[in-house]
Every structure is written in C-alpha cells, then in structure tokens.
Amino acid sequence: MMKPLRQQNRPVISYVPRVEPAPPEHAIKMDAFRDVWILRGKYVAFILMGEAFQRSPAFTVPESAQRWANQVRQENEIAE
C-alpha cells in the first residue's frame, strides 16, 4: 500500500504584490520604458494603482518588467 501524500489540502499561497508609496530614491528610471526602473541591478516596474504604487518582482530584463506592468494594468482595467 502506498503512503498518502502529506499536506494534500495545503492552501496555495499566491503572490501578493507589495503596495509601496513610490519607487525609492535610489531607483534609476529607464527612459526607454514607461514603467521600468533599475533597482540593485535588476529591473522593476512600478505602476500607480489608485493612490498607491504596485511593484513588480525583480526581472533580469527590462522588457519582462514592462510586460508585467502592461499585464497588471490590463487586468485592473478589466476588474474596474
């Protein structure tokens, strides 16, 4: 008889973006992209949602960060 898998009914923890007031002082704005900033050598997108900024996970390429920003913006337009 096989042992049952442990923790079958474990909740799925989904990624919740942190709400930040604004890109920090040391972030460098990338002119080529609408929402992308360079932060500690990684590319991070910040988008204004209502009164607060939403921050993306850190990406190694700026295109990914911008794609994330576009996607989140689209999702929020649909949600509203």
From Swiss-Prot:
One of its GO terms (molecular function) is DNA binding. The keyword Methyltransferase does not apply. Keywords: Cell cycle, Cell division, DNA-binding. One of its GO terms (biological process) is cell division. Disulfide bonds: none annotated. Coiled coil: none annotated. Gene3D superfamilies: Cell division activator CedA (3.30.730.20). NCBIfam families: PRK10113.1. Activates the cell division inhibited by chromosomal DNA over-replication. Belongs to the CedA family. This is Cell division activator CedA. It comes from Citrobacter koseri (strain ATCC BAA-895 / CDC 4225-83 / SGSC4696). The gene is cedA.
